[in-house]
Structures are given as structure tokens and as C-alpha cells.
Regions:
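Periplasmic c-type cytochrome electron-transfer domains
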Residues: 1-165
Length: 165
């Protein structure tokens, strides 16, 4: 099974869909209606869906304190840098918009799209197959993107930072 990519920011963080099967969300909207819903959608309707998706804006994270990172999240930002999370989760949307192979999965040989970390606090479960119930599990249990030893404290701080984005 696979986890779905959030539609938030989907029109500015191509490719579309977690498998990157569509070059953009503009393409995904049209092909989704045609090949999944089997509806020949007039272009003006597809444009309305595009405009709606473009209108979605991230909400401030409830992990922020008065709009700022907590001390724990600030330490987590340093952990983010230490483990080079920004090699894949970079830029204003915290994504390089590339496909990456994760583990031994062969279902999608090209890899999985790097999702934005914006509003990740509201999109559990995590990882491409939804196996991580919490952000801390992503790092502490599944060691996502981490090739070094991570302490429980570092995993907790990193989760706090990522959930603050």
C-alpha cells in the first residue's frame, strides 16, 4: 500500500502523486477525472479545481509558540542540519521535488516523491506506506534518511522541529 501525498501546495511542488507518476498537479487533475473517474471534464471545471487547490494555504503549526519555534524545536533544527535532512527536504517548501529510492521497495523503481514538510503535523501516518504513526517513529524506529545513530532525545527534538513547519 502507499500513502497519499497532501494536496496542499501540490501545484507548486511537482511532481504530483507520491509515486511522481504525473509531471504536475495540473496534469493530475485532468488525468484523474479522465482515467480514474471516467469523466470527460470540461477544461473550465479542471481550471476551477486548479484554482481551488492553489487557494489552499498552510496553517500555522500548533507546535509553534506565539508563532515561533520552541526551544526544543530549535534544537531539532540543529538535528535536522546534523543529519542532512535538507539534502531532500530543502527550500521554502522543504522538498527537492525529486524522486528517491527508499529502502528495498521495488513497486516504484524510480522512487517516491519527496513530500513537502509544510503542515506535516496534520498528515499522519507517515512514510510512503503509512507505517509510521508519529513523526518521532519516522526517525527513531524507521530511521528515515538517517544513516547514523540517533538518540531518542534527538529523534524527539527532530520530530518537534518537523512538526513545527
Amino acid at each position: 500500500s502507499k500513502n497519499c501525498k497532501s494536496l496542499l501546495l501540490s501545484h507548486v511542488t511537482p511532481p504530483a502523486m507520491i509515486s511522481g507518476i504525473r509531471a504536475s498537479s495540473y496534469v493530475a487533475v485532468r488525468t484523474g477525472y479522465k482515467y480514474i473517474q471516467f469523466i470527460d471534464l470540461p477544461e473550465e471545471f479542471a481550471t476551477c479545481v486548479d484554482e481551488y487547490l492553489l487557494s489552499l494555504k498552510p496553517l500555522p503549526s500548533p507546535f509553534l509558540i506565539n508563532g515561533e519555534l520552541s526551544e526544543k524545536a530549535k534544537r531539532g533544527r540543529k538535528v535536522f542540519e546534523k543529519f542532512k535532512c535538507d539534502e531532500c527536504h530543502s527550500g521554502p517548501y522543504y522538498t527537492d521535488m525529486q524522486l528517491h529510492r527508499i529502502g528495498e521497495d521495488v513497486e516504484f523503481e524510480k522512487g517516491w516523491d519527496t513530500p513537502t514538510l509544510r503542515e506535516v503535523w496534520r498528515t499522519a501516518p507517515y512514510l510512503f506506506d503509512g507505517r509510521a504513526a508519529t513523526m518521532k517513529e519516522v526517525f527513531e524506529v524507521y530511521k528515515h534518511g538517517i544513516d547514523k545513530k540517533i538518540s531518542s532525545k534527538e529523534a524527539d527534538e527532530l520530530a518537534e522541529y518537523v512538526n513545527s513547519l
